[in-house]
């Protein structure tokens, strides 16, 4: 049976930071891989200054998606930093899940400090009760009230360079954060690799995992 995995993210670049290595690895294992982004990903600061334009985010994401090799990418174009639970959004996500019928779903950790990440996590978890394999990832590493209970590590040593290349496509965001994301990802993946006996790894909190 053909295996399929959906990678959900609130914004363009979340999946790349949190689990691009795993996506690339699954693609090598003949999975069909899908990326679903909930927001348009452009945003302004508290003073109304545009920090990221929607069209630029879309172009950068397109380049990253090609590097990873997604079979299909979907953007639901909700407003960045204002994603809310509503029946229409639930319906859109459920239709995607039902159409693709994935064996695996990857989505944000529910304890994330970012509002959009938490909302997307809760939405997808609520709609994926029948999916056999569900994993939570982190796309930032800020301290939270909850502890991230990472309990599975995926060796991405061979996929690491391609993962970093996908993140590097988000030039506007990297410029804004002075490339700090790249070091953050390197440190996190190295630590996870050390913990699991390889050079680089991604860590996930397992909700469900069917081995046999």
Please provide the spans of the model-predicted regions.
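Metal-dependent de-N-acetylase/amidase catalytic core
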Residues: 2-6, 48, 72, 78-79, ...
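Active-site rim/loop-helix segments in enzyme catalytic domains that contact anionic ligands
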Residues: 1-100, 129-130, 206
């Amino acid at each position: 049976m053909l295996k399929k995995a959906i990678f959900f993210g609130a914004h363009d670049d979340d999946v790349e930071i949190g689990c691009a290595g795993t996506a690339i690895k699954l693609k090598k294992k003949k999975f069909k891989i899908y990326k679903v982004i909930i927001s348009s990903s452009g945003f302004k600061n508290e003073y109304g200054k545009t920090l990221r334009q929607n069209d630029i985010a879309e172009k950068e994401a397109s380049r990253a998606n090609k590097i990873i090799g997604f079979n299909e990418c979907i953007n639901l174009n909700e407003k960045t930093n204002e994603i809310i639970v509503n029946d229409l959004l639930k319906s859109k996500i459920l239709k995607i899940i039902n159409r693709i019928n994935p064996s695996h779903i990857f989505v944000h950790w529910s304890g994330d400090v970012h509002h959009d990440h938490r909302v997307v996590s809760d939405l997808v978890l609520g709609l994926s009760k029948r999916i056999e394999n569900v994993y939570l990832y982190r796309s930032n590493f800020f301290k939270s009230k909850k502890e991230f209970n990472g309990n599975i590590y995926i060796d991405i040593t061979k996929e690491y360079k391609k993962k970093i290349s996908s993140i590097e496509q988000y030039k506007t965001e990297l410029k804004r954060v002075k490339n700090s994301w790249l070091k953050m990802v390197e440190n996190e993946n190295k630590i996870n690799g050390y913990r699991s006996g390889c050079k680089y790894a991604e860590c996930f909190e397992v909700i469900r995992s069917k081995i046999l």
